[in-house]
């Protein structure tokens, strides 16, 4: 009887360790997958080497959105412009942030973006706030969504724990991410000029 108990305990421990090894990755909050915002199929194939060291924050400089429906439409508009007008393989950003407090999946954690030029695209994740932030500030829920996304990236192993945030204007001659948003990201603990 004792031998059977030992075998049973050993089998249960083995099963528990298998379950722990197969546990799902950490939850990443409100990331709207491409299919939910009705993205066009991506033709992009070039992968990022993970974990990535840099995050480049930009703004789309267009209309802002503050509901899931309007933000899904805005994500479609940005993607359509990038694909149809610029000839890119997909929306240029890895993620888009809406004023609704949701993150919209662009190219995601694994595919190289087209957001910051040939030097920075292969070594960074591009996060773009949907709207123009020259004279206005994104609402707190949008800023929280961005911060949560960055924590998610670290938890998933997509971003280094010592990642660096840069404004689009830090790596390219542009006004992006807008004066007001730029002031905010400069206060983030991972920001480096």
UniProtKB/Swiss-Prot annotation:
Pfam families: Amidase_2. GO terms for cellular component: extracellular region. Residues 1-21 form the signal peptide. Residues 50-178 form the N-acetylmuramoyl-L-alanine amidase domain. SUPFAM superfamilies: N-acetylmuramoyl-L-alanine amidase-like. Disulfide bonds join 28-152, 44-89, 65-71. One of its GO terms (molecular function) is N-acetylmuramoyl-L-alanine amidase activity. Keywords: Antibiotic, Antimicrobial, Disulfide bond, Immunity, Innate immunity, Secreted, Signal. Belongs to the N-acetylmuramoyl-L-alanine amidase 2 family. Homotetramer. This is Peptidoglycan recognition protein 1. It comes from Camelus dromedarius (Dromedary). The lineage of its organism: Eukaryota, Metazoa, Chordata, Craniata, Vertebrata.
